[in-house]
Amino acid sequence: MKKTTRSKYRQEFSGDHVFDYKDPASLTRFIGDGGKITPSRISKLSVAQQKRVAAAVKKSRNLALLPSGSDSYDTFHRAEAISPVPFEI
């Protein structure tokens, strides 16, 4: 069986790009719908860049700059989706 290899890709960030944990707007690009950090094969980052992104996201979550947990990213249970009128019999 032939081993599958990852195709070459164009890097969007230079090798020495700094992913700042104090800028949550730029880090939300690397967070999926469920609140998980996207893998490098989807975000097209190198191994070193993926490690730096993961560390920045974790640090930002610890400082409460980014929400942690899947409940924060869930669109079904948002307050505006729930009716404010109580159920009547």
Curated annotation (Swiss-Prot):
This is Small ribosomal subunit protein bS18. Part of the 30S ribosomal subunit. Forms a tight heterodimer with protein bS6. Binds as a heterodimer with protein bS6 to the central domain of the 16S rRNA, where it helps stabilize the platform of the 30S subunit. It comes from the Bacteria. GO terms for cellular component: ribonucleoprotein complex; ribosome. One of its GO terms (molecular function) is structural constituent of ribosome. HAMAP family: Ribosomal_bS18. GO terms for biological process: translation. Keywords: Ribonucleoprotein, Ribosomal protein, RNA-binding, rRNA-binding. Belongs to the bacterial ribosomal protein bS18 family. Pfam families: Ribosomal_S18. InterPro entries: Ribosomal_bS18 (IPR001648), Ribosomal_bS18_sf (IPR036870).
